[in-house]
Swiss-Prot record:
Ligand binding (ATP): G40, R41, N42, G43, A44, G45, K46, T47
Induction (record text): Transcription is activated by the regulatory protein BcrR in the presence of bacitracin.
Name of the molecule in the record: Bacitracin transport ATP-binding protein BcrA
Effect of a null allele: Disruption mutant is sensitive to bacitracin.
UniProt-listed SUPFAM superfamilies: P-loop containing nucleoside triphosphate hydrolases (SSF52540)
Function: Essential for high-level bacitracin resistance. Part of the ABC transporter complex BcrAB. Probably responsible for energy coupling to the transport system.
Organism of derivation: Enterococcus faecalis
Highest rank taxon of the organism: Bacteria
Length: 308
């Protein structure tokens, strides 16, 4: 049996500000060479957890291991392997994108002469490198942040909301770039987001945070196996439809929201249920076969409401 190698591990990682616990005993496991998506509403504790991994905030309790080593040991060696964006990247507004990266490269050290140019090309800013940062769009600023994080070719990327502010084309490009970086270069990527559809498309593993707790950690392939198929009816009266399912077919595996009833029980055909609804005077305006996605799963896990 192969032992999984983790690039990031936390054990009972906790952060308190006064009497408020913002991260509560989380145990994260980020496999080497994989993309780990950390999901959660704003205020769930995602950014604070990432800050503790980078020593931008210090744990109240618990430990962090990077590359199998306690991050308090050999700190400079460990962090030379890490690139990161936490919250909004900071740059000099009166300097060009290229000049900003040159300064950061000198401060960081270990960046090859071609590293800055290559990073700008990878994120699609090579033609804009002489433009002053204050003239960059929000999406361009976000790309420059990613360029700063990758210019020293790190083994681990920690990215807090990296697609924030990007248009659909930019999101697609960054998604493709991160996937390529992971699958071709073996870079481990730890990414936070509240955009469920984007995480679902690129992540190998997801963790879900809610009110400071890590409530789930699961391989995306396993999650897809769990997602259940269902038939959805839009009807004139959902409560009557529910009573029909219970009395006529003894069904209990369904949900009702207003005039939409979602049936997970396939003991009866869709045609039979449709006829029974019609016989009881219900108007059916839509029938659709589908299966639950990551958003459905997330909503059930944290009690509905989605991510805001």
């Amino acid at each position: 049996m192969m032992i999984m190698e983790y690039v990031i591990e936390t054990e009972n990682l906790t952060k308190q500000y006064g009497e408020t616990t913002v991260v509560n005993k989380i145990n994260l496991h980020v496999p080497k060479g994989k993309i780990y998506g950390l999901l959660g509403r704003n205020g769930a504790g995602k950014t604070t957890a990432m800050k503790m991994m980078l020593q931008l905030a210090f744990p109240t309790d618990g430990t962090v291991r990077l590359f199998g080593t306690n991050y308090k040991e050999n700190i400079h060696t460990l962090y030379s392997k890490v690139g990161s964006i936490i919250e909004t990247p900071g740059f000099y507004s009166n300097l060009t994108g290229y000049e900003n990266l040159q300064i950061l490269a000198k401060l960081r050290g270990g960046v090859s002469k071609s590293g800055v140019e290559k990073a700008l090309e990878v994120v699609g800013l090579h033609k804009e490198k002489r433009k002053v940062f204050s003239d960059y769009s929000l999406g361009m600023k976000q790309r420059l942040g990613i360029a700063a994080a990758i210019m020293h070719e790190p083994e681990l990327l920690i990215l807090d909301e990296p697609i924030n502010g990007l248009d659909p084309i930019g999101i697609s490009e960054i998604r493709s770039f991160l996937s390529k970086l992971s699958h071709e270069n073996g870079t481990t990527i730890f990414i936070s987001s509240h955009v469920l559809s984007e995480i679902e498309q690129i992540a190998d593993v997801i963790g879900v945070m809610h009110e400071g707790h890590l409530v789930e950690e699961v391989n995306i392939s396993e999650l897809h196996k769990r997602n259940r198929k269902y038939t959805e009816f839009d009807v004139s009266d959902g409560k009557i439809a529910a009573k029909i399912l219970e009395s006529s077919y003894h069904m209990t595996d369904f949900t009702v929201q207003d005039g939409t009833i979602r049936i997970y029980d396939f003991s009866q055909s869709v045609g039979e249920i449709n006829r029974e609804f019609a016989r009881n005077g219900l108007l059916i305006t839509r029938i659709n076969d589908s299966e639950e996605n990551l958003e459905d799963y997330f909503s059930k896990l944290i009690g509905g409401g989605g991510i805001a």
